[in-house]
């Protein structure tokens, strides 16, 4: 008979059926008892539990309520709360009286099933029968309030518990704390702890740990640090887990000095840091470029016989590799292996990235070969890093070969993969292959993002394919994807370089209607376009508008206007602009100095002007 059928059969069994069963089964049947031993209950299966309950309700006299509670508790641990509730109801129908323990089990199961009103009804019933709720009862109800989004009632219940003389335990506090954090009530969680202290109901280490952990997860390390200090004033000593949690949070939110101070404080108190503490600090110091401090911490860690793990080494290797300190990164890699710590995909990717960033593609490929030989399979990040390295080195054909190798390994390229290849082909002035990769991307079901479109538009414009760029741009505007300021700047620059300054100006003027604020590049592009067309007045008018309500002019703005006036022989206007530029702490750029030098040679300028510029 299936579990479902046995359950239905059991529900249909009436008291009279059970009484008739006495005649056949005898009054003294107690074979169920051995099945209720602690060891048997640990290995009890659900269908066996259903059968066992059936045996128990057919036995005469009925098993004791203690024996029923053992079975109900075992089923509750299986998380079969509905079955516990049903069996509890069946017991009442048969006249088996519940005790406080079984009422607690029932209330807990009802709360777990979000049937809080029924749980409260049972509470009322048990109190009428003279059973006062225990801390277990109230904790179950508290959990029900929290899961039922009735968090204010949960807080009120704890306050009421204290007033009634109950001593909230660790379960009480941690249940409510987790509920408060789930409902984004971090300040209420802190206030709860402080209120309980005032009422003489001191939360323990576990409760403080739960609040501090919640604050850290929410990105509030300052509040966590403040609570840690209050906790220690209350004579509750924090352990390494709490210190490490706060240190890690301080590190993640860039409070590196506070993290180091807390590390020193825990050390002075004799609380031994663990590998997690060290790894958090080392990673943070590496992110700040403080490699010597990070290395010192690693040395300190080794002196204390605290074994670094792969995370510790990865942080240092990644930092050194990015800064071009590749010898140091390789030494750390060798030390990892000497310590029998297996490098993982993150380790290899960091080294490959470092070598690619510093144009050492041969070594990057060697690391790639090594990781494959060690059965550490490369992922999309590995391939993207190598493809980008080859594309930057103008070796886009090698990048495409890597892309094919990636496919052979069953890896699907992502948006970054295709965008990198598109950019690489455009850099090599290979517009056909760039567009081919874009088409393949779409046919492979990989969705281009705005960066992909910007790369495509920029490549087409810079390679003199403005008409094709316009087709893509018009499609983009009709799609659900919103062009950004970079998109408009690319198109504006493409139009101006193609001599279509009026079209560029129309696009610039449309930005405010599209809700896009022009940036300094947008202004500089149009000012440069006007200057190349000989439209100095329009360029200067835009320059004034820029100073009044746009982004402030930068070095590029001034140098573009200075060169335009110099080419027209307007030395006075150029000198005035140079004076203004220098007051803004900008200097002449290479193009301006090149133009001035040429004009000095052919006599259009005297040496005094060079002094003005310098």
Swiss-Prot record:
Tell me the compartments it is located in. Answer: Mitochondrion
Q: Which UniProt keywords apply?
A: Mitochondrion, Repeat, Transit peptide
Under SUPFAM superfamilies, the record lists: TPR-like (SSF48452)
**Pfam families named among the record's database cross-references:** PPR, PPR_1, PPR_2
Quote a single Gene Ontology cellular component term: mitochondrion
Transit pept. (range): 1-7
Q: Where are the PPR repeats?
A: 64-98, 99-133, 134-168, 169-203, 204-238, 239-273, 274-308, 309-343, 344-378, 379-413, 414-448, 449-483, 484-518, 519-553, 554-588
What the entry lists under NCBIfam families is as follows: PPR
Write down the PANTHER family for this protein, in alphabetical order.
PENTACOTRIPEPTIDE-REPEAT REGION OF PRORP DOMAIN-CONTAINING PROTEIN, PENTATRICOPEPTIDE REPEAT-CONTAINING PROTEIN 1, MITOCHONDRIAL
Could you say which protein family the record assigns here?
Answer: Belongs to the PPR family. P subfamily.
- Record-given protein name: Pentatricopeptide repeat-containing protein At1g63080, mitochondrial
What is the species listed in this Swiss-Prot or TrEMBL entry?
Arabidopsis thaliana
The major lineage groups are: Eukaryota, Viridiplantae, Streptophyta, Embryophyta, Tracheophyta
